[in-house]
A protein has these predicted regions:
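C-terminal terminal-subdomain/extension
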Residues: 4, 67-120
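Compact nucleic-acid interaction/catalytic patches
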Residues: 22-25, 30-66
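Residues immediately flanking
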Residues: 16, 33, 81
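Short, charged beta-turn/beta-strand-edge "cap" motif at the junction between a beta-strand
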Residues: 17-21
Length: 120
């Protein structure tokens, strides 16, 4: 069944373009709201989730307690790698969501790392 909608805070699998230019299926956290998705015919923004911690200053370890159900592997939000997708690019949904209080924390870290710079 084709995906017609995703929700803010949902973890989905999408074809993510990585910094080296390769495109690989990866889990990602939907960070944009539903209004954008409705207004732009299915467009949404998501932040990369990886099992590798290559960018220590930009990653957040994901704790099982932050989710409604745990991921299959130890993983990290890679807060500086964000991309746009369309709902028709979603490869898999697993009904996994980041709890609201942790969603706000992750978004704050994305803003700090991408827009506001790191505090010294």
């Amino acid at each position: 069944m084709a995906v017609t909608r995703v929700n803010q805070g949902e973890i989905v699998e999408v074809p993510f373009e990585l910094p080296d230019g390769s495109i690989l299926p990866h889990p990602a956290l939907v960070i944009s709201n539903e209004y954008l998705q409705d207004y732009e015919d299915g467009l949404f923004y998501a932040v990369l989730i990886s099992t590798k911690n290559h960018y220590l200053e930009f990653t957040i370890p994901i704790e099982d307690s932050w989710l409604n159900k745990p991921l299959s592997k130890s993983s990290f939000f890679v807060t500086h790698i964000i991309d746009q997708f369309n709902v028709d690019e979603v490869m898999k949904r697993s009904n996994t969501y980041l709890k609201a209080r942790y969603f706000d924390y992750v978004v704050d870290e994305i803003i700090k790392n991408v827009i506001g710079g790191k505090e010294e």
